Amino acid sequence: MKILVLGCNGMAGHLISLYFKEQGHEVVGFARSASHLLDKTIVGDASNMSLIKQTLDEGNFDAVINCIGLLNQFAENNKAMAVLLNGYLPHYLVEITKSMKTKIIHMSTDCVFAGNDGPYYEDSLPNGSTFYDRSKAMGEINNDKDLTFRNSIVGPDIKESGIGLFNWFMKQNGEVGGYTGAIWTGVTTFTLAKAMEQALKENLTGLYNLVNNESINKYDLLGLFNKYFRGGEIIINPNDKLQLDKSLRSKRDDFGFVVPSYEQQIKEMREWVDAHPSLYPHYKLF
């Protein structure tokens, strides 16, 4: 398949694009700077809608994977751009590919929900209150041609400055706190990449909560990071100050992909990092 990955240098985008390339697909990246992992990157800004349209009109892609998003505080501080990238862009991609074979795969988040009345299903009404939450809810696409995967993600980042939970943990020494009341359902970016490939093979469409239908708290998740990446050297102290449950559950039974257990996902994430050491020199691994 010929795949375009929008945001191919980000935490999710770099791994997804490289995974598809390693599976033998033709992968083209789109980012503000060229990817050193891909043979071809279209360099540009995602706010340039005419460039996006030209790229899709000329590319003859089987699928476009949208890994572009303005996160959390960046969305709060740049509201117009958050509406454009998080809310408008996914629907624009759908609109300009309506008459093409090209399938859009969009990434949404558990943050479309407030976290005080979970668990949340595909048909639950998004009730997140921050500007980021609302902009991401606006961007969810749900039709019979394209696909939105709704999930939270963790994974390695080629940028040392990345703001993800795993990147944060890998910079820590000594003792850290882990929230026992922050309840999470999510996937690693490696699991997400595998699920995306399977979804294309099965032509999964609509809105799908990509989860294993089990929850884990952030304290235990950090414990898995510690076990598989730091040899247990970090002391994780339980902290119950934050109480938040954004657990996702899937009602759908029309997808053959099985999301592994959290332990298995983190184990496979370590295997990915070990197989690509030049990408992650900033991680201190045991």
Each predicted region: which residue ranges?
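Conserved Rossmann-fold NAD(P)-dependent oxidoreductase catalytic core, especially the SDR/UDP-sugar
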Residues: 91-127
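Amphipathic terminal alpha-helices
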Residues: 260-286
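N-terminal Rossmann NAD(P)H-binding glycine-rich loop of SDR-like oxidoreductase domains
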Residues: 3-23
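NAD(P)H-binding glycine-rich loop region in Rossmannoid oxidoreductase-like domains
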Residues: 44-87
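NAD(P)-dependent short-chain dehydrogenase/reductase
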Residues: 129, 141-191
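Mid/C-terminal beta-alpha module of Rossmann-like enzyme folds, strongest
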Residues: 193-245, 277-286
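Glycine-rich NAD(P)-binding loop of the Rossmann-fold in SDR/ketoreductase-type enzymes
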Residues: 77, 81-92, 126, 130, ...
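Rossmann-fold cofactor-recognition segment
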Residues: 34-48
